[in-house]
């Protein structure tokens, strides 16, 4: 769920009810029938949107004297939701970058037993790229600037040895001054090309249209190049206001990709370690690559050259984030001295996939302790 999507949405005036917030007695504002226990610091709530396991509202922060986004998450009934919540909190509390959404505050009950919800406070961003592309055609200048910021943020993420794995327009938040921040790290993973993540053509949780082909074709090999493929899909969508590979299911997704890129070369096929996948591709009719200029006749030729290097079938030949930033299309913004990297690689102390939801709840409680009143953050 995008952490701070477009403001508005019209929840109307929030009702108030007497209650006890996360450690603070007083009134509790209601948003669309949902109590938001975030007072007295955060008031004047307005509904923004909601996802599978939470609602987002804007609120006035009486300490910072500005409006913020508050994501109410109620994940504790489901292991998967607990896992994503913990992973996002762990990552975002350690990340500091202008193009990555940060966490300003976290509110929750003062005891583990009483904790039913978690409230994550973040910067309020007026819209996201998905909504923007629904409403207008972007100029080349806007496309260039947004792409630069996506890659600048991704350079930082990748330098921490983290894969986002779910880059798509709705996870790119934008404000009125065209600042862009990457959000939603619930599916993020440590980069580990040796780990066996998924079998041949099994369904994958991230949004299908932005998936790299190797995710569907290989049982191993999550590398940073999967995020570059997603950015290529996003660039194509900015150029045309429509998804470039809108597959209805994973085989259809592959057919969309090959219908534009053409059939993979023998060298590219040799990189596919899964023989079942390789045999499937070899059984398909031969397809010729479609020229990018034919698909995007009005687009900047440098943009199309970069697009070609991102949407390369073979992940070993795909451009890296550092190379993409240095591409001529982005030369007006490129500044390696102002493209910071993480201070140290990110590591998860443990693999979260196999932990029960009760243990994940304990870890979320511990991870959010620093925001409790009277708690000093450990050095």
Swiss-Prot record:
Pfam family, one: Pkinase
Residues noted as binding ATP in the record, renumbered to the chain: 48-56, 71
Sites of Phosphotyrosine modification: 204
GO CC terms, sorted: caveola; ciliary basal body; cilium; cytoplasm; cytoskeleton; cytosol; early endosome; endoplasmic reticulum lumen
Regulation: Phosphorylated by MAP2K1/MEK1 and MAP2K2/MEK2 on Thr-202 and Tyr-204 in response to external stimuli like insulin or NGF. Both phosphorylations are required for activity. This phosphorylation causes dramatic conformational changes, which enable full activation and interaction of MAPK1/ERK2 with its substrates. Dephosphorylated and inactivated by DUSP3, DUSP6 and DUSP9.
Main location group: cytoplasm
Catalytic reaction annotation: L-seryl-[protein] + ATP = O-phospho-L-seryl-[protein] + ADP + H(+); L-threonyl-[protein] + ATP = O-phospho-L-threonyl-[protein] + ADP + H(+)
Keyword presence, Zinc-finger: no
Residues annotated as catalytic: 166
Cellular localization per UniProt: Cytoplasm; Nucleus; Membrane, Caveola; Cell junction, Focal adhesion
Documented EC number(s): 2.7.11.24
PTM notes: Phosphorylated upon KIT and FLT3 signaling. Dually phosphorylated on Thr-202 and Tyr-204, which activates the enzyme. Ligand-activated ALK induces tyrosine phosphorylation. Dephosphorylated by PTPRJ at Tyr-204. Ubiquitinated by TRIM15 via 'Lys-63'-linked ubiquitination; leading to activation. Deubiquitinated by CYLD.
Disordered: annotated span: 1-26
GO molecular function, one term: phosphatase binding
Phosphothreonine: modified positions: 198, 202, 207
Annotated keywords: Acetylation, Apoptosis, ATP-binding, Cell cycle, Cell junction, Cytoplasm, Host-virus interaction, Kinase, Membrane, Nucleotide-binding, Nucleus, Phosphoprotein, Serine/threonine-protein kinase, Transferase, Ubl conjugation
Motif (TXY): 202-204
GO terms under biological process: apoptotic process; Bergmann glial cell differentiation; BMP signaling pathway; cardiac neural crest cell development involved in heart development; cartilage development; caveolin-mediated endocytosis; cell surface receptor signaling pathway; cellular response to amino acid starvation
Family: Belongs to the protein kinase superfamily. CMGC Ser/Thr protein kinase family. MAP kinase subfamily.
Domain notes: The TXY motif contains the threonine and tyrosine residues whose phosphorylation activates the MAP kinases.
Complex formation: Binds both upstream activators and downstream substrates in multimolecular complexes. Found in a complex with at least BRAF, HRAS, MAP2K1/MEK1, MAPK3 and RGS14. Interacts with ADAM15, ARRB2, CANX, DAPK1 (via death domain), HSF4, IER3, MAP2K1/MEK1, MORG1, NISCH, and SGK1. Interacts with PEA15 and MKNK2. MKNK2 isoform 1 binding prevents from dephosphorylation and inactivation. Interacts with TPR. Interacts with CDKN2AIP. Interacts with HSF1 (via D domain and preferentially with hyperphosphorylated form); this interaction occurs upon heat shock. Interacts with CAVIN4. (Microbial infection) Binds to HIV-1 Nef through its SH3 domain. This interaction inhibits its tyrosine-kinase activity.
Physiological role: Serine/threonine kinase which acts as an essential component of the MAP kinase signal transduction pathway. MAPK1/ERK2 and MAPK3/ERK1 are the 2 MAPKs which play an important role in the MAPK/ERK cascade. They participate also in a signaling cascade initiated by activated KIT and KITLG/SCF. Depending on the cellular context, the MAPK/ERK cascade mediates diverse biological functions such as cell growth, adhesion, survival and differentiation through the regulation of transcription, translation, cytoskeletal rearrangements.
Protein name as it appears in the record: Mitogen-activated protein kinase 3
Species this chain originates from: Homo sapiens
Gene behind this protein: MAPK3
């Amino acid at each position: 769920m995008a952490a701070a999507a477009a403001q508005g949405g019209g929840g109307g005036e929030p009702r108030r009810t007497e209650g006890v917030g996360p450690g603070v007695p007083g009134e509790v504002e209601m948003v669309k029938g949902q109590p938001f226990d975030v007072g007295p610091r955060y008031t004047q709530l307005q509904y923004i949107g909601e996802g599978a396991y939470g609602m987002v509202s804007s609120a006035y922060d009486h300490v910072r004297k500005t409006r913020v986004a508050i994501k109410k998450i109620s994940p504790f009934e489901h292991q998967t939701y607990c896992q994503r919540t913990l992973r996002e909190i762990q990552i975002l509390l350690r990340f500091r970058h202008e193009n990555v959404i940060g966490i300003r505050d976290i509110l929750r009950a003062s005891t583990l037993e009483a904790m039913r919800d978690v409230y994550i406070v973040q910067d309020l961003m007026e819209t996201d790229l998905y909504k923007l592309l629904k409403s207008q055609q972007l100029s080349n200048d806007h496309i260039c600037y947004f792409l630069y910021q996506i890659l600048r943020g991704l350079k930082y993420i990748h330098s921490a040895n983290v894969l986002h794995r779910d880059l798509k327009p709705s996870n790119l938040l934008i404000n009125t001054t065209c600042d862009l921040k990457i959000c939603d790290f619930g599916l993020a993973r440590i980069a580990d090309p040796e780990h066996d993540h998924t079998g041949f053509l099994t369904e994958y949780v991230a949004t299908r249209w932005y998936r790299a082909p190797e995710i569907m074709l290989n049982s191993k090999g999550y590398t940073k190049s999967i995020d570059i493929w997603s950015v290529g899909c996003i660039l194509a969508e900015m150029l045309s206001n429509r998804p470039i590979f809108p597959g209805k299911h994973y085989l259809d997704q592959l057919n969309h990709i090959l219908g534009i890129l053409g059939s993979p070369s023998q060298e590219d096929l040799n990189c596919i370690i899964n023989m079942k996948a390789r045999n499937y591709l070899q059984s398909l009719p031969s397809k010729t690559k479609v020229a990018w200029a034919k698909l995007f006749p009005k687009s900047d030729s440098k943009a199309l050259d970069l697009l070609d290097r991102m949407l390369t079938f073979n992940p070993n030949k795909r451009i890296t984030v550092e190379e993409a930033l240095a591409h001529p299309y982005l030369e007006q913004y490129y500044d390696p001295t102002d493209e910071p990297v993480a201070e140290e690689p990110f590591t998860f102390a443990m693999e979260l996939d196999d932990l029960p939801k009760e243990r994940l709840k304990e870890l979320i409680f511990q991870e959010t302790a620093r925001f409790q009143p009277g708690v000093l953050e450990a050095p």
